[in-house]
């Protein structure tokens, strides 16, 4: 770094470049209850000291820039700057560190995930002094979280709305995801709901394509819901995807869903954006609609271990932005998800108060105060043989979603739904009787096949289907 040079134009201002660590590395700093805290996994470029790199992260994500500027003297940097207050090496990794940064609350606009992310995960991720940077966790203080509405309704209100308690909810994504006409799509929805599932779902890329315009799909799905409700006596729903190219069009679709009297709509919150998602969440709360969230594009952001944003941060952001359900991985299916890491962010979605637990990747204690919780949705390559593990892993406050695991049944859609409902009821009963689903799960399913031919057929079809690959996202 070049030395500072005294200028003639002003007293006290020194033009030039100085090390970030002289201003932004503060190991003696005691964090405040109102600070937003961040834990970054940082890999500096060769020859860059970790203190300088960590300070650069704090600077470039708060008040700093590459050189001293005149206007530094017009504000209080000590009040507004981010501070790198701790650095710890990552065990077993060379030249990799966990860097802790504290941000003053006044740096962020109230109720705006968009602004929060623009600062903390903005330009700093392209900084040349860093080989890689990943945001592992955020501590959101109550002083900030209380500026957000959060989920439109939350877990307890949803259960009261649909009058279903004491078990996970069951869903199904309609397949094939693209190409069906609206009428055939609605027929599949009806058959699955009639068979015993609670919800069906638009796939994330079903919006309003030439083969099925959104208004037609909404109409046929609403008809299917009402018909299935009349036959079963249960409240049913279909996640009608309101995601659109503009916020205005998205809200128009949500309004039409409300006019049809359906209980729930859906949004792709990462591709749609946080501003759109928060707008839709506010609309859903005001108009009594539940909001299902799909996380399409998340793996682009969170799958690389050394660079990006961990999903636990995206999950916290969604809870603040607003959603009643969000996809969270399965642990046992075809999609990425290590058990303890997954359970860590599932707790961050559902619980009011979550203790720091590094064994599950939770770097900070998080207190959500009174913000409603979000139901985690397990989906992706799951079938009836997974039901015991899913029930044991996710518990009652979850949605277990079987797409191919319902519609791939050899006897048809409704028998596929019957098989999943019977398997779930058997697992819940066994658990309530004190049986260990982790050890006895397969026996529970086999016993249930004796009085459910639909389940027996499903078990035969998927008895050898496994997705056994190494998990990338490990601690």
UniProtKB/Swiss-Prot annotation:
GO cellular component: chloroplast
Entry-linked SUPFAM superfamilies: RuBisCo, C-terminal domain (SSF51649), RuBisCO, large subunit, small (N-terminal) domain (SSF54966)
Binding locations of Mg(2+): 201, 203-204
Entry's localization field: Plastid, Chloroplast
Active site: 175 (proton acceptor), 294 (proton acceptor)
Modification type N6-carboxylysine: residues: 201
InterPro entries reported in the protein's UniProt record: RuBisCO, RuBisCo_large_chain_AS, RuBisCO_lsu_C, RuBisCO_lsu_C_sf, RuBisCO_lsu_fd_N, RuBisCO_lsu_N_sf, RuBisCO_lsuI
Keywords: Acetylation, Calvin cycle, Carbon dioxide fixation, Chloroplast, Disulfide bond, Lyase, Magnesium, Metal-binding, Methylation, Monooxygenase, Oxidoreductase, Photorespiration, Photosynthesis, Plastid
Source domain of life: Eukaryota
Coiled-coil annotated residue ranges, if any: none
GO molecular function: magnesium ion binding; monooxygenase activity; ribulose-bisphosphate carboxylase activity
Broad class of the protein's primary localization: plastid
Residues modified to N6,N6,N6-trimethyllysine: 14
Miscellaneous section: The basic functional RuBisCO is composed of a large chain homodimer in a 'head-to-tail' conformation. In form I RuBisCO this homodimer is arranged in a barrel-like tetramer with the small subunits forming a tetrameric 'cap' on each end of the 'barrel'.
The protein's role, per its UniProt record: RuBisCO catalyzes two reactions: the carboxylation of D-ribulose 1,5-bisphosphate, the primary event in carbon dioxide fixation, as well as the oxidative fragmentation of the pentose substrate in the photorespiration process. Both reactions occur simultaneously and in competition at the same active site.
Protein's UniProt name: Ribulose bisphosphate carboxylase large chain
């Amino acid at each position: 770094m070049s030395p500072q040079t005294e200028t003639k134009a002003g007293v006290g201002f020194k033009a030039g470049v100085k090390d970030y660590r002289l201003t932004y590395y503060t190991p003696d700093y005691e964090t405040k209850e109102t600070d937003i805290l961040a834990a970054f996994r940082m890999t500096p470029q060769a020859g860059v000291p970790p203190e300088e790199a960590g300070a650069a992260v704090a600077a470039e994500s708060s008040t700093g820039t590459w050189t001293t500027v005149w206007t530094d003297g017009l504000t209080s940097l000590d009040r507004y700057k981010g501070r790198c207050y701790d650095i710890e090496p990552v065990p077993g990794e060379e030249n990799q560190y966990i860097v802790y940064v504290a941000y003053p609350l006044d740096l962020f606009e109230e109720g705006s995930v968009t602004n929060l992310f623009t600062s903390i995960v903005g330009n700093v991720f392209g900084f040349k002094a860093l080989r890689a940077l990943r945001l592992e966790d955020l501590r959101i203080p109550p002083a900030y979280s209380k500026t957000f509405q959060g989920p439109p309704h939350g877990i307890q209100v949803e259960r009261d709305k649909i009058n279903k308690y004491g078990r996970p909810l069951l869903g199904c994504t309609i397949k094939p995801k693209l190409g069906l006409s609206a009428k055939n799509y609605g027929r599949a929805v009806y058959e699955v709901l009639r068979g015993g599932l609670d919800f069906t779902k638009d796939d994330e890329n079903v919006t309003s394509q030439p083969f099925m315009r959104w208004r037609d799909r909404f109409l046929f799905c609403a008809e299917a819901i009402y018909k299935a409700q009349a036959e079963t006596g249960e409240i049913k729903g279909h996640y009608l995807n309101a995601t659109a190219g503009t916020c205005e069009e998205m809200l128009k679709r949500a309004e039409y869903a409300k006019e049809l009297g359906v209980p729930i709509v859906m949004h792709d919150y990462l591709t749609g954006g946080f501003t759109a998602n928060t707008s839709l969440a506010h609309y859903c709360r005001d108009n009594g609609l539940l909001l299902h969230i799909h996380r399409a594009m998340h793996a682009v952001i969170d799958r690389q271990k050394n660079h990006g944003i961990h999903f636990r941060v995206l999950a916290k952001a969604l809870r603040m932005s607003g959603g009643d359900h969000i996809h969270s991985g399965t642990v046992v299916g075809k999609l990425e998800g290590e058990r303890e890491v997954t359970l860590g962010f599932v707790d961050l979605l559902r619980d009011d108060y979550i203790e720091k637990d590094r064994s599950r990747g939770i770097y900070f204690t998080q207190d959500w105060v009174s913000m409603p919780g979000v139901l985690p949705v397990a989906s992706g390559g799951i079938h009836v043989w997974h039901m015991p593990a899913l029930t044991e892993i996710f518990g009652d406050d979850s949605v277990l979603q079987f797409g191919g695991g319902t519609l791939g049944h050899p006897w048809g859609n409704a028998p596929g739904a019957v098989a999943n409902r019977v398997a779930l009821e058997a697992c819940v009963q066994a658990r309530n009787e004190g049986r260990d689903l982790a050890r006895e799960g397969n026996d529970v399913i086999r016993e249930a096949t004796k009085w459910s031919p639909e389940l027996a057929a499903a078990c035969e079809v998927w008895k050898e289907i496994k997705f056994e690959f190494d998990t990338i996202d490990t601690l």
